[in-house]
From Swiss-Prot:
Role: Has a role in meiotic chromosome segregation.
Classification via Pfam families: Abhydrolase_3
One GO molecular-function entry: hydrolase activity
Any one Gene Ontology cellular component term annotated for this protein: endoplasmic reticulum
Name this protein carries in UniProt: Uncharacterized protein C8F11.08c
Location (main, coarse): endoplasmic reticulum
UniProt subcellular location: Endoplasmic reticulum membrane
Biological process according to GO: meiotic cell cycle
Domain of life: Eukaryota
Membrane topology: Multi-pass membrane protein
Keywords in alphabetical order: Endoplasmic reticulum, Hydrolase, Meiosis, Membrane, Transmembrane, Transmembrane helix
Amino acid sequence: MGFATILYSIWVVLSSFVILSAYQLEVRKFLVKLLSKIVIGASESNVASFFAFVSEKSLEAASVKFVATIIAERMGAQFSSFYDKIFFVDMLGLGSLFALAAVNVLAARKLESELPASLEPSIGNRDQQKNSSLAKCFSRLFINDLHGTTVKRYPYISYLPNWLLAKNNAERLVYKSHLLLNAYSPPKSASASSVIVWVCGAKKSESIIIPYLSSLGFFVVVPNYAQPPKFPLSDAVEFVSLCVDWIVENAIYYDADPERIFFLGEDTGASVALESLKHIRPNSVKGIFALCPRSIQNLVWTNQSTIPMMTLHAGDVNPVSDSNDRESSEKASLIKNFVVPGAVPYYYEFTSPRTISTATFIARWFFLVEDNKKTI
């Protein structure tokens, strides 16, 4: 009976701290550092991913807590004189988890009723439904080795701040967008890694460029955001901006430097990345590379940032000065709609932007920006 009470008490204390960490950033930081030292083989990033899982999956966490309470009673903990007090604290935590789950559902219902028809996504995206499964979410607790011992991938990590957890889950139910990110961590080095935020294009597939850049020493973050034209540009910009907030808050867990964040946008993602610069803290992004950018209708550039920018287009001819043929004329029109102060367009003839040669060009540009060897 005494042993069962001790175990139950330890469980209640630990689970209460975990629940509290979903709302208090300082508590989570303390637990991440503590558990990474106590649990053998667990890194700070693994522990941080675990807390993200508990925060997002409140109903599953509540179920585990409920089962643990039943096990404690079966072991005889209820016969202890301290059981009532411990049980009361346990029920406070259980109630908090159920309340968070209820808020998520109610908020989603309210959000869905207010949502304009134009924002409603197509129903039945089975790939996204699979990503929301419990087993899929558990997979982010472990490191997936992509390329031997060079690049480590941390999948399905939440990038929304803790104070938006309820809104996160509510919008996930309505928008069918998971608001998660994949992170690629390079081999450990003496200094913290620079961060590249890869804002993907319409096809939403991850390029070979991503692990390649990571193998060169960059910490690459790929947000799963609401992409235009299926979603409004404002939603995409909001999600990418929140991703930057996540990096600033969590970079320490991945040996990355939150003061050295770069944007790499492809296709429509380049437009989203550029537009995001107007909505994030000034100078939080140190440079931006636009890969084959695609113009978004009715998007008016008002960005006045002086950060280094590079635009990479397909073709070896400057379409602005040589617009005799139809193809060059179309490119010239694109450039006209894609004028960004500080951007330097570069025309590189290639069959596909997703190649190692293109990645080498991109990496070289980022290294030049970091070393201040070239004014862009």
